[in-house]
Amino acid sequence: KKLEETGHTAAFSDAEFQRILIHVENHSVYESAKILRDKYVLELDDGNTVYIDFFSSDTTRNIYQVTHQVTMDPDHKNDVVYKNRYDVTVLINGLPIAQIELKRPGVEINEAINQINRYRKFSFKGLFRYLQLFVVSNSVQTKYFCNENEMANGQYQPILKSLVFFWTDEKNTRINELH
């Protein structure tokens, strides 16, 4: 229950934290990215106002975490349709920003892309709407793609294969194995 607050970290009351959650949850992917870049003006319980940066431009002040096998279960979360287990999730300051789906060598990379499309449609809810980047790998190929908004009618459009790119280094040399 701590967020960075211009220069220092402060604990928020349950009511203050709830206001922050309401501000960040259930937006489109684009709106979520904008919220992460902007300052949030929070009125504290005592009437004072603070400006919250969700990410610091000084990257050393952010907290980076990696989770393994996070499970979303409809028995525990009402807006999740199917039970899913995500391979690797990268969080910055507690917000999920990147999702990595790993497959065994020999498994087609498109299976990982299709799996993420299912996750996007049925289980990436709440704070998982903040996912901005997906990485898929089978140790033979490694590719990445950005998350995108649902269509105007609220339906999800699958990630287009033409918008999935090979992972490369700064000289545009393909990187296939993740270490």
What kind of feature is each model-predicted range?
Residues K1-H179:
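An alpha-helical interface "stripe"
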